[in-house]
């Protein structure tokens, strides 16, 4: 419930900020940005009502794992939108944008396959696959997109570098949380994991 509320607040905040904006690029930015918490609020509401939840039997585990696949559905839409925001800010070309979003989708889908796998080996293999895709996304952000942004005004460069640093730090926490959470080694419980993912989602 809290996640839904916070995401709705974020949605209305960006609607208010973007209201009456006439600059074409700024309107584009707000249109994309509004969608991110809007989609996330729908995903969190579905999880609140027990939709988007399944159980997976994993070899060697006494109890089946509860997997919130709605979380992955959320990320499959919201993470490309966040990257699209950064790419448009950097004035990146279509090939760069397509590559970045394609690899990002691969990262999310392989993470979901890992979460739904029935053996520890398969789960960790898919996690590794997803993490490699994430590292590629990170590399693209910090090199290709940063180079594109470097050709623009100082204000744009500063904004881009700040947002990219924030994304890099926050997104790095996701594969770490996956591997130590219930979907991985089980060092932290479902409650802590869910809360941590909510904090990361809201902050990102």
From Swiss-Prot:
Function field: Light-driven proton pump.
Record organism: Halobacterium halobium (strain mex)
Protein name: Bacteriorhodopsin
Entry keyword annotation includes Transcription: no
Presence of the UniProt keyword Transmembrane helix in the record: yes
Record topological domains on the Extracellular side: 51-70, 117-123, 187-192
GO biological process, one term: proton transmembrane transport
Record topological domains on the Cytoplasmic side: 17-30, 91-96, 144-166
Membrane topology: Multi-pass membrane protein
Family statement: Belongs to the archaeal/bacterial/fungal opsin family.
One GO MF term attached to the UniProt entry: photoreceptor activity
GO cellular component: plasma membrane
Top-rank taxon: Archaea
Alphabetical keyword list: Cell membrane, Chromophore, Hydrogen ion transport, Ion transport, Membrane, Photoreceptor protein, Receptor, Retinal protein, Sensory transduction, Transmembrane, Transmembrane helix, Transport
SMART domains membership: Bac_rhodopsin
Location in or out of the cell: Cell membrane
Entries under InterPro entries matching the protein: Arc/bac/fun_rhodopsins, Rhodopsin_retinal_BS
């Amino acid at each position: 419930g809290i996640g839904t509320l916070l995401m709705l607040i974020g949605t209305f905040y960006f609607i208010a900020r973007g209201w009456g904006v006439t600059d074409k690029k700024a309107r584009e930015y707000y249109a994309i940005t509004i969608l991110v918490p809007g989609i996330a609020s729908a995903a969190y509401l579905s999880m609140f009502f027990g939709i988007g939840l399944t159980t997976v039997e994993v070899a060697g585990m006494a109890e089946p794992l509860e997997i919130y696949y709605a979380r992955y559905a959320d990320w499959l839409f919201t993470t490309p939108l966040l990257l699209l925001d950064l790419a448009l800010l950097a004035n990146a070309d279509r090939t760069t944008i397509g590559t970045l979003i394609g690899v990002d989708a691969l990262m999310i889908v392989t993470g979901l396959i890992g979460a739904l796998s029935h053996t520890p080996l398969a789960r960790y293999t898919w996690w590794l696959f997803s993490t490699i895709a994430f590292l590629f996304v990170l590399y693209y952000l910090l090199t290709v997109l940063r180079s594109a942004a470097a050709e623009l005004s100082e204000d744009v460069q500063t904004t881009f570098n700040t947002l990219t640093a924030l994304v890099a730090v926050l997104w790095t926490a996701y594969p770490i949380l996956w591997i130590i959470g219930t979907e991985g080694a089980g060092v932290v419980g479902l409650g802590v994991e869910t809360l941590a993912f909510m904090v990361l989602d809201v902050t990102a």
